[in-house]
Amino acid sequence: MRRVSMRSLKRYLKAIWDLLRLEHGLMYGFGVVIGIYVSDPFFSDLWKLLLGYLTAVFLQASTFALNDYFDYEVDLVNNRTDRPLVRGDLSRRIALALAIALMPPGFVAAYLISPLAFIFAFAVSVLACLYDYKLKELGFAGNVYIAFTMAAPFLFGSIISSGWITEKTALLASMAFLTGVGREIMKGIEDVEGDALRDVRSLARTMGERKAASIASLFYLTAVSISPIPLFLLPEFLFDLKYAVPVSVTDVLLIYVALRLVGDYERESIRKYRKVTLVAMVLGLVGFFAGAF
């Protein structure tokens, strides 16, 4: 009996983790830390750093729970067994309750940092709710929003440490944004059947999967094209191997995906390529963080 109970508890906790996508929250929090130190390598207020990290984790978890609440029927059609609601491990009511409960702590943490930090966090969260409810159906506009959320942690970090968005952070955010748009267009290809249920106007549905894949490739190549800029224009990164080496690997991975997408945009391939781009983004974060010191 005890063994069964422990197994049930582990399954429940895993379902909560999967619903909230806490691995993404940890990465978003790390993005805030990177934004802080890319903007100001000598930042020393650990209390604000912790608050910034918690803001990202709480708000990200809340919006992912809300996303699964609204996307339940689409995820069923797409057979998204990685989603706990589809597996039956959690109810939609629990997902909605968690979405509502986790947002206020994120706002409180942001408010304790500064008024500007609170305004930024609140605005991003409002957009997140609109996206989960309706913006997603607008297709490319929704892709742009999600890509912005990938860049937002760096901008938020810069606001925490410098009170504004620095050039260094803006470049980092731009690369994250461009890569994020590519990833979201690919997700539209992967989810094209389920998106028909909500009449999501993704590029894959409005222009065809082949053209959508080509556009995603273009965004990846654009991200690669701006990655050398810090090496030549920002004094802190001038010919810095700590930045150049990991970012070069990032570029190679993104170029690989961009070239493969032109002729291979099957569902299974898209899933694999999205994982490759996630690795590329993590390496890019490492490069910017290392180059800041």
Curated annotation (Swiss-Prot):
Q: List the disulfide bonds.
A: none
Q: Does the keyword Transferase apply?
A: yes
Q: Which GO terms describe its cellular component?
A: plasma membrane
Its Enzyme Commission number(s) read 2.5.1.42
Q: Where in the cell is it found?
A: Cell membrane
Requisite cofactors: Mg(2+)
Q: Which stretches are transmembrane?
A: 26-46, 50-70, 107-127, 140-160, 215-235, 237-257, 273-293
Its family? Belongs to the UbiA prenyltransferase family. DGGGP synthase subfamily.
Q: What is this protein called?
A: Digeranylgeranylglyceryl phosphate synthase
**Which species does the entry assign this protein to?**
Archaeoglobus fulgidus (strain ATCC 49558 / DSM 4304 / JCM 9628 / NBRC 100126 / VC-16)
